[in-house]
Regions:
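Short alpha-helix boundary/capping elements
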Residues: 5, 60-64, 136
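C-terminal accessory module of base-excision DNA glycosylases/AP lyases that mediates lesion recognition
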Residues: 69-140
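Compositionally biased, intrinsically disordered low-complexity regions enriched in proline and serine
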Residues: 22, 31, 47, 53, ...
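Residue-level detector of well-ordered alpha-helical segments, enriched
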Residues: 2, 48, 52, 123-128
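Catalytic DNA-binding helix-loop module of base-excision-repair DNA glycosylases/AP lyases
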Residues: 35-85
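Helix-hairpin-helix/helix-loop-helix acidic hairpins
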Residues: 1-48
């Protein structure tokens, strides 16, 4: 039921509106993330699918905007990466954020972007997610 509901939400969107949400997440206040991560109406386990929402947006951008800057518009929201972010925040002496604050996708994105900005080597949001996830998977 939850998957069907998410499909209905996506199918309700006009193609140009969907592409606009994907192309300009900040300018649309991450509206597509909000739409996809609203709690489902599943009778047994209604869920708020923030991880799915971010992955959908991330991979849709990779598909629709391949080779363009917009292909990296959405970092994947993941509990492993979320749990590792405070280590990077401390290392780079960035503004501290609580784990609860990092549950907000916009705050999560801002944190990822700050860390990437302070990294010694250029790295994409996608690259950062993969490196952190691979390193910390099984270590937390």
């Amino acid at each position: 039921m939850g998957r069907e509901e998410l499909c209905r939400r996506l199918l309700k969107l006009d193609r140009d509106v969907l592409l606009g949400y994907l192309k300009d997440p900040e300018g649309t206040n991450y509206r597509l993330i909000d739409i996809l991560s609203e709690q489902t109406n599943a009778p047994f386990r209604p869920r708020r699918n923030l991880s799915f929402a971010s992955k959908f947006c991330h991979y849709a951008c990779l598909a629709f905007f391949k080779g363009k800057e917009a292909q990296d518009n959405y970092p994947v929201y993941d509990n492993i990466v979320k749990g590792a972010l405070p280590k990077y925040i401390a290392y780079f002496s960035l503004n501290r954020r609580s784990q609860a604050a990092l549950s907000d996708y916009q705050t999560y994105c801002e944190c990822v972007d700050e860390i990437i900005t302070h990294a010694d080597e250029p790295i994409s949001r996608n690259g950062f997610d993969h490196l952190v996830w691979c390193y910390f998977k099984g270590r937390q």
